[in-house]
Structures are given as structure tokens and as C-alpha cells.
Swiss-Prot record:
The lineage of its organism: Eukaryota, Metazoa, Ecdysozoa, Arthropoda, Hexapoda. Keywords: Activator, Chromatin regulator, Cytoplasm, Metal-binding, mRNA transport, Nucleus, Phosphoprotein, Protein transport, Transcription, Transcription regulation, Translocation, Transport, Zinc, Zinc-finger. It holds the Pfam family Sgf11. A zinc finger (SGF11-type) spans 102-123. Belongs to the SGF11 family. This is SAGA-associated factor 11 homolog. It comes from Drosophila persimilis (Fruit fly). GO terms for cellular component: cytoplasm; DUBm complex; nuclear pore; nucleoplasm; SAGA complex. Component of the transcription regulatory histone acetylation (HAT) complex SAGA, a multiprotein complex that activates transcription by remodeling chromatin and mediating histone acetylation and deubiquitination. Within the SAGA complex, participates in a subcomplex that specifically deubiquitinates histone H2B. The SAGA complex is recruited to specific gene promoters by activators, where it is required for transcription. Required for nuclear receptor-mediated transactivation. Binds independently on SAGA to promoters in an RNA-dependent manner. One of its GO terms (biological process) is positive regulation of DNA-templated transcription. The long N-terminal helix forms part of the 'assembly lobe' of the SAGA deubiquitination module. The C-terminal SGF11-type zinc-finger domain together with the C-terminal catalytic domain of not/nonstop forms the 'catalytic lobe' of the SAGA deubiquitination module.
Length: 196
């Protein structure tokens, strides 16, 4: 019954005499079914009138300030269409993977994106193999022109040269010899030198 739930919050804020009056009115309305229907209709009409009045006031306010189009909301651009074309998804976007090409800043070649980093290493001479080759070149140059190069560097005339000639971090003497197959198997714990 909607009539019994509505006056409960208002009763708590009112004085005790008003609560008694509301309770007495409620008991009278619930005793007679004819009055109960009348009270329910009055409550329904009151709620409907409040809702309609609220909407009317809101529309009137929006019209006065010029925002009546805001009541309509944002119009959809077009209905969503499902695309049924091969090699396209339902939205019409291609599903085929596109090869992305990058331009090398050093040699201006087009290179696939997956191969760009290795190409750039080789192109600029900064990869592992390139640095080994460059180190070997420096080592051979040091051996042939060590006397002329050292007098040039120590005189302080290294204006345009690189800093690589003075590096002590690499030496060709420190290379380890590769172990042979025989030397690895001689001390092995697997067969202790026994043949089966």
C-alpha cells in the first residue's frame, strides 16, 4: 500500500501531536475501502502532477536560455552497418597486416620495420661484428704506424682525430685460445677416460 509508506519520513520530523493526528487519519483511511481508493487516486494524481510540472519547467527553462536542442541529445551520425567484404572486419577496417617500412637515416634505404635495428647497426658500424672488425683494423693500424701515430698523439695535435688510439680497454694479446675437442673430454667426469 503506497499510502502507508509515504508519511513515515515526515512523521519523524514533526511534533508528537502532529504524529498522532497523521496516525489517526491513516487509521480512518484504512478502515473504509472506499476512502482508501480515494486516497490512492489522490496520491497518484499528485505524483503525476509533480512529474509533469517538473518536465514542463525544465523544457521552459531550456527554451528561454536557448539550449532546447540539448534536450534532444547528440544525434548519431549513421546507423552501424556491418561490413561483409573479404579481408575486412565488421567495421570495414583491413585485417591484412601491412608491412611498415622505415627509411634509414644513414643510407636513405627503405627497410622493413622488423629489420630496421639490425640494418642500422650494420649501416653505422655499431653492431657486434662491426665493432670486432673495427677493432681488428685498429689493431693492425697500431702495429704498422705505431711510431708515427704515438708522436702525433703525444704532441697534442689530436684536433680532428678520435679518442680510440689511446684506449687501453682492448688488446689482441688477451684473446683466449679455443679449447679443442680432445682437451674437453680428457678431464670429463662422464666417462673418466674409459671407452666402452
Amino acid at each position: 500500500m503506497p499510502t502507508s509508506a509515504a508519511p513515515v519520513p515526515a512523521v519523524a520530523a514533526q511534533s508528537p501531536t502532529t504524529r498522532k493526528a497523521i496516525a489517526n487519519n491513516f487509521r480512518e483511511l484504512t478502515k473504509d475501502p472506499k476512502k482508501l481508493d480515494e486516497a490512492a487516486n489522490q496520491l497518484y494524481e499528485s505524483l503525476l502532477e509533480d512529474a509533469v510540472t517538473g518536465i514542463f519547467i525544465e523544457v521552459h527553462h531550456l527554451r528561454k536560455i536557448g539550449n532546447l536542442s540539448a534536450l534532444d541529445g547528440v544525434a548519431e551520425e549513421s546507423a552501424h552497418r556491418i561490413c561483409d567484404v573479404p579481408n575486412l572486419d565488421i567495421f570495414g577496417v583491413s585485417t591484412a597486416k601491412k608491412a611498415i617500412d622505415c627509411t634509414c637515416p644513414n643510407c636513405d634505404r627503405l627497410v622493413a620495420a622488423a629489420r630496421f635495428a639490425p640494418h642500422l647497426e650494420k649501416c653505422m658500424g655499431m653492431g657486434r661484428i662491426s665493432s670486432r672488425i673495427a677493432s681488428r683494423r685498429l689493431a693492425t693500424k697500431e702495429g704498422t704506424s705505431a711510431s708515427s701515430n704515438s708522436s702525433y698523439v703525444h704532441s697534442g695535435a689530436n684536433a680532428g682525430g678520435t679518442d680510440d688510439e689511446d684506449d687501453v680497454d682492448w688488446s689482441s694479446d688477451k684473446r683466449k685460445k679455443k679449447s679443442t675437442q680432445n682437451s674437453r673430454n680428457n678431464g670429463s667426469k662422464k666417462n673418466n677416460g674409459k671407452t666402452f
